[in-house]
A protein has these predicted regions:
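An amphipathic alpha-helical core segment
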Residues: 135-179
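N-terminal Sec/ER secretory leader and immediately downstream segment
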Residues: 2-97
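Long, hydrophobic, amphipathic alpha-helical segments used as structural scaffolds
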Residues: 60-63, 67, 109-112, 128-135, ...
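Mid-length scaffold segments of soluble, non-membrane domains
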Residues: 79-143
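Proline-rich intrinsically disordered, low-complexity coils
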Residues: 5, 11-12, 17, 24, ...
Length: 179
């Protein structure tokens, strides 16, 4: 059964389109909430509901495919410190890559955002069922992932990273996307 019902947050939108046709309506509602200019810079609205569901479901796992993220990729490259035999670590300069997105996320008005989520919830639930969870409740998964993120420890220093090996004779022109 449902552990974290959405019904009490706001009633679902009575005029929701089918999930397959929902992108324009979802983008319109997100633009009203966040502003059209910020929406274009920070979020991917094509398949937004499915992207959110897939990303949330994968966040508690070892890999969350970036092609399904509901956010736009950062413009700058991922940078590491260390070469040769030295351990490779996440460079401190990487934090600056996310400062604009962090400011955007912190400025999202929480109560209207939660109400919009509840209004659109039937779409999120349908996308979760289509992902392979027909008898599970997406909001329960969302709450579990949020709890997991909140419990994640703050790293004491730079994180060690490892380049994912790709066995090919073709030189990789963008190795920074493989960390």
């Amino acid at each position: 059964g449902q552990q974290n019902p959405v019904d009490a947050l706001a009633p679902p939108d009575a005029a929701l389109p089918a999930l397959a046709e929902s992108d324009p309506r979802v983008a319109e509602l997100l633009a009203e909430l966040l502003g059209r200019d910020k929406l274009a810079v920070f979020l991917q609205t094509d398949g937004f509901v499915r992207r959110v569901v897939a990303t949330v479901d994968n966040l508690g796992r070892a890999h969350a495919p970036s092609r399904m993220w509901p956010v736009q990729p950062t413009a700058q490259r991922f940078v590491v410190d260390g070469t040769g035999d030295a351990p490779t670590t996440n460079a401190a300069a990487n934090a600056a890559r996310y400062s604009a997105f962090l400011a955007f996320a912190e400025a999202v008005p929480m109560e209207p955002a939660v109400a919009l989520y509840a209004r659109l919830y039937p779409l999120f639930q349908q996308a979760y069922e289509e992902l392979g969870y027909p008898r599970r409740y997406f909001n329960d998964r969302l709450v579990a992932v949020l709890d997991q993120l909140l419990q994640a420890p703050e790293p004491a220093g730079p994180l060690q990273v490892k380049l994912t090996p790709v066995n090919t004779d073709v030189p990789n022109l963008r190795p920074w996307v493989r960390y």
